[in-house]
Swiss-Prot record:
Biased composition (Polar residues): 51-69
Propeptide residues per the UniProt entry: 22-177, 192-319
GO CC, alphabetical: extracellular region
Cellular compartments annotated: Secreted
Protein name per Swiss-Prot or TrEMBL: Prohormone-2
Signal sequence range: 1-21
Species whose genome carries this gene: Apis mellifera
Length: 351
């Protein structure tokens, strides 16, 4: 009895293993055979190219439809040759659709990604990126303004039935991009400010008044009332300190008239004050006009000698020193320590 149960369990296990080993459908079996028959380099290239349909070669190329003799033999032996041909015919329209969409994928990758999701309802891009600075009411106002300005912005799925010309497709892509981009006005950050401008003006005026009219002197005088600032005291003017000659002119004024002017006074450069010879009584002019020197040493610019005179001559007289000459004989009387402090001595030092 036990042997029968054991044989029954073994047969059930073997049946389960056989069922699990069988493929679910013939399509998966053909795919597995294709993968085993292809070399590893082609399989690695296909894995790298997964999802990028634009790099696939079209079906018209004879190299893609060509199969090796070894692959044909294996398919003929397994009886799957007709099934492979049917699968290739089914894959042809799907590949043609991907080729039609390849142009849009090259120009705008997001465009194809949006359309693959299958959105049939028009999408309105009214969400403001400035959610950090605006409230819901402000966002609603901005969305209404942008809707009025730009109209309805929608995404339209391109037709995949017929391949359009390059110029028409480029124009459609550009218009589609323009419609998708939302138009925003310049942000107004002053909406967030809760400060009253009058309060700001009062604060600024108080700050400026505090800088200009500082009243810390008043507080210091209240704290130290009996303190007298010696620097602020002004000495009374003494009548003895007033110098009378500062108010008067340095040289006495000289009034000219047409009768008093001589031709020699016109155009002469004044190198001396007007009352120069009147002050010294023409002592320098008389010195050189005497017959001791004959004629003046230097010629005059004008024939009339009324104002300009020759320069003074200076002579050096050399004397022999005597043996009893003491150059420091008179130095003692000018020393400060030799006389009493009360005596009005001359303020000079001898070196």
């Amino acid at each position: 009895m036990m042997c029968d149960w054991v044989w029954l369990l073994l047969t059930l296990c073997s049946l389960l293993m056989i069922v699990q080993s069988l493929p679910t459908n013939l399509a998966e079996d053909t795919k597995k055979t294709e993968q085993t028959m292809r070399p590893k380099s082609k399989r690695a290239q296909e894995m790298l190219m997964f999802g990028n349909q634009q790099n696939h070669q079209p079906e018209n190329n004879p190299s893609s439809s060509y199969s090796s003799t070894a692959e044909k033999r294996t398919l003929a032996a397994s009886g799957l040759g007709g099934l492979k041909a049917a699968l290739i015919e089914e894959e042809k329209p799907s590949r043609s659709n991907t080729l039609n969409n390849a142009f849009y994928d090259r120009k705008n990758y997001d465009y194809g990604a949006v359309n693959e999701l299958g959105y049939e309802i028009p999408q309105v891009w009214d969400n403001s990126p400035y959610s950090r600075y605006y409230t819901n009411e402000d966002r609603r106002k901005r969305s209404e303004k942008s809707a009025v300005a730009s109209g309805s912005s929608t995404t339209i799925k391109p037709s995949t039935t017929s391949f359009q010309s390059p110029t028409s497709t480029q124009q459609s892509v550009q218009t589609q991009v323009k419609r998708n981009v939302p138009i925003y006005q310049e942000p107004r950050f002053k909406r967030e400010l809760d400060i009253d401008p009058e309060d700001v003006l009062t604060l600024l005026s108080l700050w400026e008044n505090e800088r200009r009219k500082r009243n810390w002197h008043k507080y210091m005088n209240e704290e130290y009332e009996n303190v007298d600032d010696e620097d602020n005291l002004l000495e009374e003017e003494d009548s003895r300190n007033i110098i009378p000659w500062m108010d008067s002119s340095v040289y006495p004024p000289r009034h000219y008239s047409l009768d008093s002017l001589s031709p020699s006074d016109i155009g002469i450069i004044r190198t001396h004050p007007s009352s120069y010879y009147e002050q010294y009584e023409n002592q320098y002019g008389q010195q050189y006009d005497t017959s001791q020197y004959g004629s003046p040493q230097y010629g005059l610019v004008y024939p009339q000698q009324t104002y300009y005179s020759a320069p003074e001559k200076r002579f050096m007289i050399s004397r022999k020193r005597s043996q009893a000459y003491d150059p420091y004989s008179n130095a003692a009387q000018f020393q400060l320590s030799s006389q009493s402090r009360g005596y009005p001595y001359q303020h000079r030092l001898v070196y």
